Amino acid sequence: MAPKKSVSKAGKELEVKKKGGKKEPVVAVEPPLAKEMKEFYHIQIRDLEDRLARYQRKWDELAVQEKMFRQEFEQLANNKKEIVAFLKRTLNQQVDEITDLNEQLQNLQLAKEMEKDAFEAQLAQVRHEFQETKDQLTTENIILGGKLAALEEFRLQKEEVTDKFTLLEEQVRKQENEFRDYAYNLEKKSVLDKDRLRKEIIQRVNLVANEFHKVTTNRMWETTKRAIKENNGITLQMARVSQQGMKLLQENEQLKGRQNNLCKQLELLENTQKVMARHKRGHQKIILMLTKKCQEQQQDTKEAEELRLLLSQLEQRSLQLQVDNQALKSQRDQLSLQLEQQQVDLQRLQQELANEQKVRASLEAALVQATSFLQNILQMHRDEEDSDVDVTFQPWHKEMLQQLLVMLSSTVATRPQKAACPHQESQSHGPPKESRPSIQLPRTGSLLPQLSDITPYQPGDLGLVPRQVHIPPNPQDLRLLSYITRVGTFRAHSSPEMRAPGSLKRLEKFSLPEVPLRPK
């Protein structure tokens, strides 16, 4: 670009010289200083063209970034709308849940009160019935205790009578056995005695007969006398035996009468035993009835205990429902506090959005003014390509570019401060992460660091490498330049500030307008 413009300028100068040569054939000899200035201006023009192309690229990048920022901002607005709608929907759901829980709690309280009244009435009725049954059973127990005592006495008497009866039976059996043995022995003895007496009589008779036969001849009288005596003795013995038999018969009759008496007593005892067995059956039935009533009473007591346990469980359930009610109330209060906090955050976000919109509008205005300013500079540069180049234009041009960069850098410098203030406020006044929902904001400040990285122009800085520290000029590079260029670069490195000459007052129409850096 620069060589073509220089060639066109040289052609125009030659045409002008030719036209002037027709009038005055004067040969203009260019001094060496003008050549050096021309080279210097050519170098400056190349630098400015490169810088202009670089600024054009940066402007395109900024336009693309501004478009991306606008898309991110629209996405942020949509996300914010969705978040607000979601929060409202969740809030409505929580409010509905709270109302449902309140209704359920009221219904449970009413049901609990009704159940409590019903159970209290049932418990009072059960207590009354239990007291009545208790009194009735105590009286029945007293009566049955008396009956049991009588039955116990009767049982003892019965045992005594049965023992006596068994003893009497044993005695009767023993006496019968003894009587039978005695009668058998007597009969046996009588039979044996009869046999023995008969044998003895026969033997005696035989002996007597023998002796009689013997003594008949000798002692007839003595033998007869002796036989009479023996006969008398035998008759006496026979009388004694008959008397003993009579006594035995009398004793036998007495034993038979005693046996009859014992049989009668046995029949009486059997009758009394049957009567006692009947009474025993009746008492057993009464005891069974009493045991059944006692079991029923125990079952009633168990039911009363179960009712007491059920009542205690209902009381515990009512206490648990009260605790749940308190927890639901506290949860409702927390949700209301979270809702208020979210409303405050929503207002703050809306305010930040308004501030961002204002700052964005100010940035757009600054960019529009900067683009118009650059277009004016380019237009002025194109207009002056056809005319004579003023020596004082180049420093003024540098000063205007530096003023443009200062304006852009000040705009970028004020923007991060405003972007950092709401972030600090949100960190200082924001609720904890647990109570506030996480809202992921888009990267709105992605454009700001890139704008803040743009350093203001300094003379001698081509902008290819960002310089953060002062780099002194290389003497070997300065040898290739002319004296004026070396002095200019040295002054640019020593003092970056430049003053516009007084002849530039005619270009005041290209001065930068005032740009509001902060939103009103």
UniProtKB/Swiss-Prot annotation:
The gene is CFAP157. Belongs to the CFAP157 family. One of its GO terms (molecular function) is microtubule binding. Transmembrane segments: none annotated. It comes from Homo sapiens. Residues 1-22, 416-453 are annotated as: Disordered. The keyword Coiled coil applies. GO terms for cellular component: ciliary basal body; cytoplasm. Specifically required during spermatogenesis for flagellum morphogenesis and sperm motility. May be required to suppress the formation of supernumerary axonemes and ensure a correct ultrastructure. It comes from the Eukaryota. Interacts with TUBB and TUBA4A. Interacts with CEP350. Residues 10-22 have a biased composition (Basic and acidic residues). It is found in: Cytoplasm, Cytoskeleton, Cilium basal body. Residues 33-189, 236-372 form a coiled coil. Residues 437-453 have a biased composition (Polar residues). PANTHER family: CILIA- AND FLAGELLA-ASSOCIATED PROTEIN 157. This is Cilia- and flagella-associated protein 157. Keywords: Cell projection, Cilium, Coiled coil, Cytoplasm, Cytoskeleton, Differentiation, Spermatogenesis. GO terms for biological process: sperm axoneme assembly.
